[in-house]
């Protein structure tokens, strides 16, 4: 999956992040990053924001695991436990995001 495809996949699920109330960055291997800014009323995407220092939570994972996460075939909690993704910043925000991805 390319970064363009990854961004499209997130954009397709963007409304799922309404009410998150935070800014979350996905650092996807060496490919780049996608930031979801859901701190306002309407979630927005920023592609390749350089890891986004303003993010409340940064989730680091491979493109393969990102694709599975967005598709709903990778359990975020299990992926964290197994080391398939790493969290920097607020774990609480990551848990809230995980619940939104499971819906």
Locate predicted features.
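Feature captures hydrophobic
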Residues: 1-103
